Amino acid sequence: MTTTSPDALAPAVVPNFDDPATEGRKLAIICSKGTLDMAYPGLVLANAALGEGIETHLFFTFWGFEMINKKTMNDLQFTLLGNPATHMPQGLGGLPWMTAMATSKLKKSIAEVGVPEIPEFLEQIVASGGHLWACRMSADMNHLTEDDLYDQVEGIISASDFIEKTEGAQLLFI
């Protein structure tokens, strides 16, 4: 059974983890990209899995750290440069104002469909029972500690530890 929450930051749907159809299912999502357009796929999939009652873990590594770094998580960018899916001439992507314009347009489009910004989306995922993990190697490479990361990150762990925590999970690399 699901319930609707009056709290805007709480999940709209609270999953029923007692559903026999999802019992024992796990999803592990590796978030390795730090651009606005690549931040959302992992979060959307995590949110969907949690809504189905599936145990969900996100592992932020390499540029994916931008999503959980307190200094950068509110300022992820979207660039047209090198992105053929935008169907625009590549030369336009190099113009100084183009990244700001593309980022603004994407943020507006995301907001129009009711998807929260990155920090609120992470909060919603955690409130729904999701687990957030930071990669030890990436933290060390960037000289970051837990104090630098989004408060709901459960810990900085090694890739081996993540594999152990998510044993038997379906794995998605984004």
Roles of regions detected by a PLM:
Residues T2-D19:
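Positively charged, low-complexity intrinsically disordered leader regions
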Residues A28-A39, I68, S109-E112:
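Short, glycine-rich nucleotide/cofactor-binding loops
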Residues Y40-G53, L58:
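Histidine-anchored nucleotide/phosphate-binding helix
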Residues T56-F62, W133-R136:
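Short internal beta-strands
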Residues I68-F78:
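Glycine-rich loop at the start of a catalytic domain that most often binds anionic cofactors/ligands
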Residues P119-S128, W133, N142:
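A short aromatic-anchored loop/beta-hairpin motif
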Residues D147-I174:
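Glycine-rich, aromatic-bearing surface loops/beta-hairpins
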